[in-house]
């Protein structure tokens, strides 16, 4: 009997406090671009305008939307894709039990009800990538949508994609995705990793993690499932994901050969690529830069090869003493990618796993190969981003960005942190956010989040929330440092609310309103404390902002500028001191 995953099984929350979902009409009929509007209260009768911010939460925060996971979410891109006239529906490959890592399909696996839908692919001789359209001077609906989200002109979006400086990951089989862009001249993006393992997690939990991560601001998610039900879990996630979904196909290919790396073949891997492309995966991490000649260089490392995909391919290369089949078949992979518009995320299989190994010969040798592969992908008009480290101390971070921009001709950089120290298990979301903020400032386009469970275990829901928020902080700090034209507006609004003691506005304007209110209410839970002109840190007598208010009020009453009021007040206090006898202690 077929099971199902219902909305009742998982926690789906509405919009954040003080916020509402709004839509901006696009230039094409029916195009509605989501935003989150944060309302603000008045200041002495003077209205404070609402603040609109980028929204990744999909329909789940729309009060008018009824969640039905078994049907999937709306498909805003479907008409755009079909309207271009360059795709066709076809039968697709047969879904087999081995796709879920089993020999016989289990009746207990919650099969997605619409698994029989026909996938799309490019018509014979066509190329359906956003890069292909951009290079041919076409501004697609997806590009127009992105331009509204980013606050730029559509032509700027087209040019950045055409030049390879940005990617718009948008598989034609993932029409549910709300278009977004990854590039250093746009907002810095954040990816959240989810996925089951052989020892933990269920399909319902992973769908919930996806909706949870996007609620807190994840711009993309990667399904890194390595346990059973990989295909089915991915189907549930993609059909309900409003953001692009990435995978590492070698993980599933390995499951198909019972976890024995040396039994992997190009044929098994190729079949897996097509399977996932038909489902709608938007970008693939492919470790094609792990070459046979680079593997011995890692022997002198402190932590060797720490990438799962990198170690799998290294083991295969050494066992067969052959070159990496992902490298030798790269042109064929490009042919598959452009049929579905799957973007490359060229994997850093030799990334450093400790600061002792940062910026070493193995890491930068692989980067040279990724630069070579980028040129090949671009020859096919396939979109590319480059994955980066890893564990890198602060003084070595900038070199990574400079080398990537030079070697990979400006392709977007997508980094895991980097972690800036190795001594803080349980706090690696912090050690990595330090590096993430720096490398984002230097030009990284997307940051892969790290949770407190990094190196320790599979993250739960709360870990996902902490990881996403931590990385949204790093990404926003980078946007501010780069001078993004709208980045400071939210900061300015929150600072004004803080100075005016509009506590609820402070909470609502923050990245995590619920956590901010929770911490405030631990010491001042009364409703009256939400309007008090102090908090529990300094109390009523020592609040610096309250004192600043008093100075301004004094200046106003005495018809003085604020600086004059301070000087006058200081003189008055000096006279009081003299009159009291000029004693330091009375």
From Swiss-Prot:
| The UniProt record lists the keyword Iron | yes
Annotated residues that bind substrate are located at 193, 222, 251, 287, 307-309, 348-351, 387, 414
The UniProt GO MF terms for this protein read: 4 iron, 4 sulfur cluster binding; carbon-carbon lyase activity; zinc ion binding
Functional summary from the UniProt entry:
Catalyzes the synthesis of the hydroxymethylpyrimidine phosphate (HMP-P) moiety of thiamine from aminoimidazole ribotide (AIR) in a radical S-adenosyl-L-methionine (SAM)-dependent reaction.
Query: What pathway does the UniProt record associate with this protein?
Result: Cofactor biosynthesis; thiamine diphosphate biosynthesis
Protein name, please?
A: Phosphomethylpyrimidine synthase
Q: Which GO terms describe its cellular component?
A: cytosol
Q: Please give the cofactor(s) recorded in the UniProt entry for this protein.
A: [4Fe-4S] cluster
Which residues does the record give as Zn(2+) binding sites? 391, 455
- Return one Gene Ontology term, BP aspect: thiamine biosynthetic process
Catalysed reaction(s) here are: 5-amino-1-(5-phospho-beta-D-ribosyl)imidazole + S-adenosyl-L-methionine = 4-amino-2-methyl-5-(phosphooxymethyl)pyrimidine + CO + 5'-deoxyadenosine + formate + L-methionine + 3 H(+)
User: Where does this protein come from, organism-wise?
Assistant: Bacillus cereus (strain B4264)
- Alphabetic keyword roster: 4Fe-4S, Iron, Iron-sulfur, Lyase, Metal-binding, S-adenosyl-L-methionine, Thiamine biosynthesis, Zinc
Residues of the region (Disordered) are: 1-33
